[in-house]
């Protein structure tokens, strides 16, 4: 394996892991990082989706006890059945819309400038939701993921579907969408983690199968390296985020999105950075 190519795969994996579960858009950061590293092309787009499996496995490991309890109780326990059904319901909107529009979105919007615009718009939406929650008599209607109804799950799933637009953020859309519809910050964040499991796995399987002609057995080490880097960084990020939200809101991430998005737009306009499409 080419050492430079391996280093690029590791960097991309780290970027994926650290950004997948923060409301700042992993896809957007991967597009920008790939542009800077000159790591682009049709096969790289498959790589970017495939290494999400590493981030997904980090959630599986962190919540292995909860997941085992749900799987073990699927046939007998109402609580486990309800939780699993909520995940399926929330997964469907993005999955169905993705099947219809994913190719067009990749063709038109997987570029630095559209990503930067989505960063900025998403940042202002986060600020609006956080301000609403601070400045009103807002009280979370749903305190834990086990309190969610099927309608709550559907609403979060519809919010997550907006993340098909690169730069929006899957976790940001599902977390902020959940908070908008009455979930507590902790419930929205944890449900977003669980929702990532079928969402990321489904995206990986679909992308690898659809673009299988681009791939070969020789790609496995590179994909594995990126996936492992994503697993380690995502595991650290999930643990940190759970501590962070116990005492903080998401305002910092909103400002980060706005500032970083403006930087990308200005750097593209003035030629400070050469962003490859």
Swiss-Prot record:
Keyword Nucleotidyltransferase: no
Protein name: Undecaprenyl-diphosphatase
BP GO annotations: cell wall organization; peptidoglycan biosynthetic process; regulation of cell shape; response to antibiotic
Functional summary from the UniProt entry: Catalyzes the dephosphorylation of undecaprenyl diphosphate (UPP). Confers resistance to bacitracin.
Compartment(s): Cell inner membrane
Enzyme class, spelled out: hydrolase
GO molecular function: undecaprenyl-diphosphatase activity
Catalysed conversion reaction: di-trans,octa-cis-undecaprenyl diphosphate + H2O = di-trans,octa-cis-undecaprenyl phosphate + phosphate + H(+)
Protein family membership: Belongs to the UppP family.
Pfam families per record: BacA
Cellular component terms (Gene Ontology): plasma membrane
Protein topology in the membrane: Multi-pass membrane protein
Higher taxonomy: Bacteria, Pseudomonadati, Pseudomonadota, Betaproteobacteria, Burkholderiales
Misc remark: Bacitracin is thought to be involved in the inhibition of peptidoglycan synthesis by sequestering undecaprenyl diphosphate, thereby reducing the pool of lipid carrier available.
Record InterPro entries: UppP
């Amino acid at each position: 394996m080419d050492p430079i190519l391996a280093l690029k795969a590791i960097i991309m994996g780290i970027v994926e892991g650290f950004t997948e579960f923060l409301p700042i858009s992993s896809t957007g950061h991967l597009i920008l990082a790939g542009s800077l590293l000159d790591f682009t092309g049709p096969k790289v787009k498959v790589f970017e989706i495939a290494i999400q499996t590493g981030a997904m496995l980090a959630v599986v490991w962190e919540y292995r006890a909860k997941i085992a309890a749900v799987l073990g109780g699927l046939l007998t326990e109402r609580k486990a059945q309800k939780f699993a059904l909520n995940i399926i319901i929330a997964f469907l909107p993005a999955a169905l819309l993705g099947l219809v529009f994913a190719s067009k979105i990749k063709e038109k919007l997987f570029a630095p400038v559209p990503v930067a615009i989505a960063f900025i718009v998403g940042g202002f939406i986060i600020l609006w939701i956080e301000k609403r929650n601070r400045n009103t008599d807002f009280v979370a209607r749903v305190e834990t993921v086990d309190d969610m109804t099927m309608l709550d799950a559907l609403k979060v799933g519809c919010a997550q579907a907006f993340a098909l637009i690169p730069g929006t953020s899957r976790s940001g859309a599902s977390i902020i969408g959940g908070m908008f519809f009455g979930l507590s910050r902790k419930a929205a964040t944890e449900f977003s983690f669980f929702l990532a499991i079928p969402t990321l796995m489904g995206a990986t399987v679909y992308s690898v199968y659809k673009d299988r002609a681009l791939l070969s057995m020789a790609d496995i080490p590179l994909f594995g390296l990126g996936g492992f880097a994503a697993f380690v960084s995502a595991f650290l990020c999930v643990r940190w985020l759970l501590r962070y939200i116990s005492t903080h809101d998401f305002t910092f991430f909103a400002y980060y999105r706005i500032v970083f998005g403006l930087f990308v737009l200005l750097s593209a306009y003035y030629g400070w950075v050469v962003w490859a499409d």
